[in-house]
Amino acid sequence: MQTNYHMSVLVHEQAKKYGDREMLIYQDFGGKEWKSLSWYQVSQTVKQVSNALLNLGVKVQENIGIFSQNSVQYIECDFGAWGIRAVTIPFYATSSEQQIQFMVNDAKIRYLFVGEQDQYDKARRIFSLCPTLERIIVFDPMVHISTHDPNAVYFSDFLKLGENLPRQTEVDKLQQ
């Protein structure tokens, strides 16, 4: 028996099957120690991302930028965005300011996820040149967000918008 799932549903189906079994082993930004996440943990964070994006008003087929090296948060954003049928636009972690500006404007990106300090700094410098860009969401909690930057938040604060999965019914409908 073959069951076809939308990509966004796969992580949740695997979480039902494997629960607390290890899914990912990773190092935090700049970290030296290895950590792991279970299928259940990743599934829950992906749901929070989907809910948070809906709370920000992200629509079906809207573009969301990810300007980061590979990370757990990158994966969670990909699956979370796909869960509401949004499109993730990947940026090279080494993209120049001109490249970022072009991609943000061309794709009409409102929300740009960034990884580390260098990526945040570049995104902040081009922010005013990108009329559609509303918010920079920073994965690495060690990044220094300027006190003069009301348009940037940490990923952990972004996730609070999806805490308790307030819009999960809508997310589930979008995944059918």
State what each model feature region is.
Residues K16, V58, N105, Q175-Q176:
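Short, flexible hinge/linker loops that cap or flank conserved catalytic cores
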Residues V11-L37, V143-S146:
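AMP-dependent adenylate-forming
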Residues M1, W39, I66-F67, I89-P90, ...:
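A generic secondary-structure micro-motif detector
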Residues L24-F79, S96-Q101, Y154-K160:
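Conserved AMP-binding/adenylate-forming core of the ANL superfamily
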